[in-house]
Amino acid sequence: MKRHAVHSLLLALALVLLQACAVDVAANAPKSATPPKSGEIQSVNAEPPFMRGFSRLDECSEPQVGSLAVEDGTTYGSGVLIDPTHVLTAGHCADGVTPYWFISGGEFFKIHAVLLHPNYKIAGVVFADIAVLTLEAPCPATPSPLLSRGYQFARGDELTTVGYGGGIKRKSNPGVFWYYGTTVEEPTSFKFLPLDGTIWFGDSGGAVYNDSGVLIGIISSLSITRGHLFENSAVRLDVFLDWIQEATECN
């Protein structure tokens, strides 16, 4: 197990202030910004720091990536449409909270069933951070194409993320992210570095695409130690293709 263990994003906010620990991407957006000090000029149109390296999207852009919401419509995470009635998300987005709606293009689609991977947690530690959501009615957005069996990852391959970091639908700019590698300790995920931008609270369950627009990962976590954000992680979908096929065929 890695030294700086990555906890569930739903618990991460309580741990961020502790030194020498790693935290996951939490589902909820920041509550508010710090008010300016006396005599300080604050730009009304200034983007929040987590938008560095990203562009805002309107709800009708990239509609295959939607937000998740509880029954009252409160949003808290992201999901990716992979066929008209099935959505992939991070497992922790369905752990301790029940996703009720998948919101695509501003339209609400009721979630009929939630299936967590059977190895989501092993000995209380998140291992397979993935879940399949089944919609009651088909979503008209064009689904994301999944990677094929035998897909080869290579260090330096350009990546693009789409999610709801900070409660804002956003897409990483070209060149911001690239594939870094997979660790022995976490064989079900891959790493990309937060050098020119980072995934953020609310991106959980969002999409990671390669340079051909193929869905290769689901956003899982970020890691912080001693106050330094040093790592972004995504679920490796090549590891779970058989389970995804079985889950979508049975639900």
Model-derived features with residue positions:
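Short, small/polar residue-rich loop motifs at catalytic or cofactor-binding pockets
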Residues: 73-76, 200-204
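Chymotrypsin/trypsin-fold serine protease catalytic domain
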Residues: 126-199, 203, 224-247
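Extracellular/periplasmic catalytic domains that process cell-envelope and extracellular macromolecules
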Residues: 57-61, 73, 81-82, 106-108, ...
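Bacterial N-terminal signal peptides
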Residues: 10-19
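Bacterial N-terminal signal peptides that target proteins for export
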Residues: 1-10
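Short beta->alpha transition motifs characteristic of CBS
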Residues: 90-95, 200-202, 217-225
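Terminal peptide-recognition signature
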Residues: 66, 79, 85, 89, ...
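Protease-domain processing segments flanking chymotrypsin-fold serine proteases, especially trypsin-like
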Residues: 21-88, 97-104, 112-115, 176-181, ...
